[in-house]
Amino acid sequence: VKRPMNAFMVWSQHERRKIMDQWPDMHNAEISKRLGRRWQLLQDSEKIPFVKEAGGLRLKHMADYPDYKYRP
């Protein structure tokens, strides 16, 4: 069972598509670096919708898998 996405992952899922549309030949590593820099530059107020969505995903995950324990 996969862990639920955190706020960065929720946001980056949307943003990655935009970058790939603009630069389809860009390597995944470069896209990830750009996403990391962009996330750091976002204001906390801009992150709120993604934090809320990630919280909802976490709650749903807890309800769906009540005995889940992360084991790397």
From Swiss-Prot:
The keyword DNA-binding applies. It is found in: Nucleus. GO terms for molecular function: DNA-binding transcription activator activity, RNA polymerase II-specific; RNA polymerase II cis-regulatory region sequence-specific DNA binding. One of its GO terms (biological process) is negative regulation of transcription by RNA polymerase II. It comes from the Eukaryota. Residues 1-69 bind DNA. The keyword Membrane does not apply. This is SRY-related protein ADW5. It comes from Alligator mississippiensis (American alligator). The lineage of its organism: Eukaryota, Metazoa, Chordata, Craniata, Vertebrata.
